């Protein structure tokens, strides 16, 4: 006798029912917790709240297409023109931020090693000044070297990330970072680069190439800012507090120090992602 249709549709008496995914109580395993946060889009991951380059360029194109219409209402045209001006300003800020990000990542290692060298030199000069047997002539020399080392440390800490970094130390593979002050040591000791003293003459300044001249101008500008108390006179103390590279203390991150031509500074910021040779490799050795 054939089985009843209702009995066929019912559950098998010896088969365990399958859990219903819509009913969490029907499953033996604990339900996976749902994520409580959403990953924001790439354009929204900016601390300044500025969208990404692609989104800004797309918005500018759409705004220009809207302004190209002839039958646009006067009020809407004015508001659209204002929006275009705001978008172009945001695009310039985003491009600048991208240049700063790339240069910061590119020269981070170079700045780190030069910062470590300068901190070692500062400790060495401090130790020599504490020596009571040091003569007055040597003491004045050590004070001068200590000041120059601090100027160079501020140079490294506050170098604008919109520009290509110009190295302070020559790329000498045989030079060590040994702090030993023994003059009889066979290994070459770490020495402070003679970039500020002796002071170069006018003829020597005229013979400098462009990267060397720009580095010297930046060092003089850094010294002036230290004299005006806009930069720390003892920058080595800020390293313990997590000093951020590329930030000009007291003036803001948009200040271009040591550059006389503003147009050249804007071109350097706009062309920061170009493929020209880096100034670091042009003037690494002196």
UniProtKB/Swiss-Prot annotation:
GO BP term, example: maturation of SSU-rRNA from tricistronic rRNA transcript (SSU-rRNA, 5.8S rRNA, LSU-rRNA)
A Pfam family matched in the record: Efg1
Nucleus keyword on record: yes
Region (Disordered): 1-57, 167-213, 259-286
Keyword Nucleotide-binding on entry: no
Keyword annotations from UniProtKB, A to Z: Coiled coil, Nucleus, rRNA processing
PANTHER family (UniProt xref): RRNA-PROCESSING PROTEIN EFG1
Stated role: Involved in rRNA processing.
Protein name: rRNA-processing protein EFG1
Organism: Cryptococcus neoformans var. neoformans serotype D (strain B-3501A) (Filobasidiella neoformans)
Gene name for this UniProt entry: EFG1
């Amino acid at each position: 006798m054939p089985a009843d249709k209702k009995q066929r549709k019912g559950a098998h008496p010896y088969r365990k029912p399958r859990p219903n995914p819509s009913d969490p109580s029907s499953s033996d395993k604990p339900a996976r917790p749902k994520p409580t946060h959403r990953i924001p889009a790439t354009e929204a991951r900016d601390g300044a709240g500025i969208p990404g380059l692609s989104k800004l360029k797309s918005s500018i194109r759409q705004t220009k297409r809207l302004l190209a219409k002839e039958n646009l209402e006067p009020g809407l045209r004015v508001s659209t023109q204002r929006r275009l001006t705001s978008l172009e300003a945001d695009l310039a800020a985003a491009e600048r931020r991208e240049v700063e990000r790339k240069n910061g990542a590119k020269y981070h290692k170079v700045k780190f090693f030069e910062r470590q060298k300068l901190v070692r030199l500062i400790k060495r000069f401090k130790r020599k000044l504490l020596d009571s047997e040091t003569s007055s002539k040597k003491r004045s020399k050590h004070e001068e070297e200590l000041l120059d080392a601090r100027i160079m440390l501020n140079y490294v800490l506050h170098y604008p990330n919109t520009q290509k970094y110009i190295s302070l130390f020559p790329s000498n593979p045989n030079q060590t970072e040994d702090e030993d002050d023994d003059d009889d040591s066979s290994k070459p000791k770490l020495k402070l680069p003679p970039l500020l003293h002796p002071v170069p003459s006018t003829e020597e300044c005229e013979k400098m190439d462009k990267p060397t001249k720009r580095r010297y101008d930046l060092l003089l500008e850094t010294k002036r800012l230290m004299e005006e108390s806009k930069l720390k006179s003892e920058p080595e103390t800020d390293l313990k507090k997590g000093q951020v590279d590329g930030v000009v203390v007291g003036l803001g991150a948009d200040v271009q120090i040591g550059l006389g031509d503003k147009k050249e500074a804007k071109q350097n910021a706009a062309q920061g992602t170009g493929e020209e040779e880096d100034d670091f490799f042009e003037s690494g050795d002196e």
